[in-house]
Amino acid sequence: MNILIRIGTLLCLGCVAIGTTFSQPNYQIDVSGVKYPIRKGHLDLGGKSITGESIEVNSFYIERNGEPYFPVMGEFHYNRYPNQYWDEEIKKMKAGGISVVATYVFWNMHEHKEGTFNWEGDLNLRRFIELCQANNMDAIIRVGPFDHGEMRNGGLPDWLYGRPFEVRSNDSLYLDYVNKLYNQIGKQIQGLYFKDSGPVVGIQIENEYQHSAAPWAITYEGADREYTSARFDRKIIKAGVGINEMGNDYAEYGQKHMQILKKMAKDAGMDVPIYTATGWGYASIVKNGSIPVMAGYAYPFWEAGNKPSPFYLYKSIHQNPDYAPVSYTPEDYPSLAAELGTGMCVTYSRRPRVLGKSFLPMMIRTVGSGSNGLGYYMYHGGTTPSDGFYMYSEGFGLNLKSYDYQAPIGEFGNAGDGFYHLKLINAFLRHYGPILAPLIPVIPETNAGIQPEDTTTLRYSVRSDGTKGFLFMHNFQDHISSPDLKNLQIKVKTREGIISFPENGTLTLKSGASVVLPFNMKFSNIAFKYATVQPLCAFTNSGIKYSVFFSIDGMVPEIALRDMVKVNTIGAKTLLRNGSPVITGNHGFTFEFEVDDNHFLIIPFEDALHAYLVGNPGDQNLIISDVLVLENDQKLELIINGKESWNLRIYPKVKNIESSEVKILSEKPRMRFFSAFQLSLDKIIPDINLTQYDDRHFVLDARKFDFSKVNDVFVNFDYRGDRAVCMLNGELATDNLYTGKPWQIGLKRYAKELKNNDMYFYFLPMRNDAPYLGYLDKEVLPDFSKNREFLEINNPEVIPEYKISIKIKRD
């Protein structure tokens, strides 16, 4: 029966995905016959809480309280960040649109010495999960025993090395040790599970089992590497995420192992509605008892070279997962990702530079291909702990301390470009994920012939139920540049007729751009025929419904309504087309229209990057500002980096904002439906001396500075060289392998030690025969014609970061 359903599904999708390229760049796709069977009740997953909430899992998506649910997961390792700042960092993740915090429990940190467990300080898992709960964030805990995460031995303790059993096997001696670990974890999070109305909705069992392993740290120069896997798995084990075309002679053994681990986890108290297992590259999962989560790394350090990846090409990801073949039947499970590479670590010889602008197109592609859950690895960087010069880092060329990962939020809590770009898809999924999740992906025939190097054929897909849906497009490819795609028109054939994007004329999809466009959808109960603006969020304020969209450069903002209704516009114009209103505006400008007391706001792309929805349901506002906006109970916390004056706009308009910490000047807004303010504070010049001793050494003295005056202080080194290290109190504090980006170090976590100690920075020159030169952008490569070594350090900066609180007065 299952085989017949699966074959029927493939035939159906083949019939409906009719894409034709005309003589001009026009594209057509037929979704009118879309059909896809969704199975329920076959998975040993799901559960209820003591308050009656429920989570269920079918073959296509997760349901929460009976409604489709689209989780957005961000990885943040509590053990790689100072615990006194966890709360602020979780708030940043929430502001970025994350709904589920994922984290690893690294066994070797918690049981460094056999039989002695440590759950204190930065290893206080319980406190971390409690802070997730306090911020209304769910959590998925990746409990190992093996994790990887570029950790020493992949998280396995050193003392397991050489024991008379195979690690990651069904040997009873090994499983006894794992059972002790699981029981410890279970006790730490007792009462915090979903069933208790707690935040822990999921547990990941093992990691990349029968797919990947880490090198044992106990080794010798010149010796073959030994890996943290059972010997019988060695021939299929990889150093990183990849494709296994060999199959697995021990697949049945692996499934048994995963079943044993799940039972042990449940017996230890880890009873949750969602169990996951990494499913890529033929890894073993718990058959029908776990969701096989997926990955996508476009810039992997474990593979040599700069080859364009397939992770920007649309596909039916539910039937054909990335890194296929897999060990399970994909159609039996929803497609969820755990490790979409929002960043990448580097090694001494391989240094992939990952741009924040690469994150959003990958997510648009992944969601448009049928994924019903996103998971970012890493979303928040950190610093790998050490004990003196005992390093917990995996080593073997990786950073010894820094785990910045080029992530959306970096090693020291600094938000980068990727943070702001991902906010757009995260906000869309938060508000429209329940509508999107049941919609079926339809892939055009033109996609079948696209190779990563083809940057002239439009990359697009549709998710639809045959009538309504969303058009997904992007124009990005890793490692190569993409030209603007001009004079495009995309036709979507639905059961109610053909929808053209746009109806008249054409559009341009600029290089690097990505977009999600709706058709035959209702927003605030107003029927849209189509729109060339992307939905961002929807909310209610004082009983009035608001929907917010943003425009994309290269596309005339156009909203075609389906019915003849009265439209009031501000900053836009309305025309009649085929008897229905069409609202048009200009890209780069804000405009609003109103239908039946429902308000629709269209803002430029740049404003959307810096937009935050704040407040309680029913009483919310949109804030636009280029500072970071966090919610803290009834207050807003603003984090301001390196400036003392900034602007803030609020929609819909409010009476005022209040703060005892800053000067507030009310401004006349450009659009009358906004409130606008200018905020300023007194400049603080940190009493910190940074002295250059020679061409390689800097010494920082912060003994006189009171760190309580600021939220943080960043030292910024704009340098070109091989690498740099930061030493404090005789130990390595952090390090940097040069990738072309400035090196930023936050000082607040070191404030106590800096009261009595200098901080030392040591830089080494780049050589003309360095193995990583091919990874660096041409603009940063030095001229080696006169010297075989090069080191350049521009004037370093000491930059204060402020945090202030404000309160919105709505009445």
Kindly give the residue locations of the regions a language model identified.
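N-terminal carbohydrate-binding accessory modules
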Residues: Q24-V100, I804
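Aromatic-lined ligand-binding clefts that engage carbohydrates, nucleic acids, or primary amines
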Residues: D706-L728, F761-F763
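Extended carbohydrate-recognition surfaces in non-catalytic/accessory domains of CAZymes
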Residues: G41-H42, G46-G47, S54-E56, R64, ...
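Bacterial Sec-dependent N-terminal signal peptides
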Residues: M1-P25
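Aromatic-lined substrate-binding rim segments of carbohydrate-active enzymes
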Residues: W86-G154, D158-W159, K262, K266
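Carbohydrate-binding surfaces of carbohydrate-active enzymes
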Residues: R163, Y174-Q188, D196-I205, Y209-H211, ...
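Short strand-turn-strand beta-turns centered on an Asx-Gly dipeptide
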Residues: N65, N578, M727-A733
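Active-site region of glycoside hydrolase catalytic domains
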Residues: A134-I140, P145-F311, Y323-C345, S371
